[in-house]
Amino acid sequence: DKAMSSASLIKAFTMAASYENMEKIRIAEGMLLKADSASQTVTDKLFRLMENMVTYSDNESFNEMVRLQTASNQFNAGARVINRYLREQGYKETAVLHTLAPSNTDPEGLGSSNMTSVEDCGTLLEKIYRRECVSPEDSDQMLSLLLNQDTRTKIPGGLKESVQVAN
């Protein structure tokens, strides 16, 4: 088990950190939208961002979710919040270090490439499956997003249609 460039795998960790930090994210998004953080407008926007990031692997949604981790709406500050969460959860080889491209966001980061490991990925997915990631309800929502993943050619590509895959 060793750290490697994460590519889009980092989005699952950002999803987990975002569920953990959802109250602050709601406040940050409410400020941007000039809406109450508990409003349906904020709820709908955050759901679309999360769905686009996880289900459709949208890079700009990832960049925006990282920025929303703090009221400053700055990528590097948000990355530090996520990385603190990752350390607290025991993900030793995973870190958000850079924006993802292609996207509308100018390249920015704390380092060269986002990192993760096979062990960290397996641990996160197991926690989600066992309903132990943030809360049972949040785990269910995360699993639903993963089950609806739009890209079906890689991980589930060689499996029978009847096999349920969350990726």
Would you name each region that the model predicts?
Residues 50, 60-133:
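Mid-domain, small-residue-enriched loop/turn segments at the edges of structured enzyme/sensor domains
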